[in-house]
Amino acid sequence: MVSSMRSLFSDHGKYVESFRRFLNHSTEHQCMQEFMDKKLPGIIARIGDTKSEIKILSIGGGAGEIDLQILSKVQAQYPGVCINNEVVEPSAEQIAKYKGPVAKTSNLENVKFAWHKETSSEYQSRILEKKELQKWDFIHMIQMLYYVKDIPATLKFFHSLLGTNAKMLIIVVSGSSGWDKLWKKYGSRFPQNDLCQYVTSDDLTQMLDNLGLKYECYDLFSTMDISDCFIDGNENGDLLWDFLTETCNFNATAPPDLKAELGKDLQEPEFSAKKEGKVLFNNTLSFIVIEA
């Protein structure tokens, strides 16, 4: 029975659609916006000191919504200073979406963009082959370390690219989130794939400690409304199930006992809160800021 369950990553279109539903039904981007508004200005306060150009490296920049927020904060901190913003993103579709708003945003005259259609490991290999380790003032990795095979090596490499006063920002799900409980209890019962691994801020901070890197970690509460998951035949619910379990067509292919057990657990307090008739999954995010 389990063999009929396929990884969501085996169907790119389905993955993109379920991810969109997740964004529409969660406070993920609002949570990130809050961090950018309240915390980021202090974090980037010195990254451009005495520099004629600020170099920013976005790893897994996606469609650029959060990248543009980051750029606006850097511009506000360093008005008129040239910014070199390079983006490493493996999806051509996401790069195309990123370029659209950039072309329409009027205040980006001092920002130079470059996009590289590659994974972080492909970028790492290319840079190491060139033997030109360019230093960066700000590197950010937003919700992408799940897709990296060797996370400690990736952290070590990109940390080595930080220049004077530079910072690296990583955003991942928190160890206090429902994701942590979900993956620990059910991860082995979901389809296995080599494209994604279960990692939370607890895992990352342990890796950073092992590497001897200096960092600060901030948690911000976020939720995902999964109420539709409990309505039979609801398309939104089906796609949110797929996203939660990283399974293609979970509702149609999962064994009944797994569906029943998971459906019950997801309504328990350690996974979700119930508010005004809604079931709100704990999507708390961690923002980890690493020093050069």
Curated annotation (Swiss-Prot):
Transferase as UniProt keyword: yes
Record note on quaternary structure: Monomer.
Protein name: Histamine N-methyltransferase
One Gene Ontology cellular component: cytoplasm
EC number: 2.1.1.8
The reaction(s) this protein catalyses: histamine + S-adenosyl-L-methionine = N(tau)-methylhistamine + S-adenosyl-L-homocysteine + H(+)
Family of this protein: Belongs to the class I-like SAM-binding methyltransferase superfamily. HNMT family.
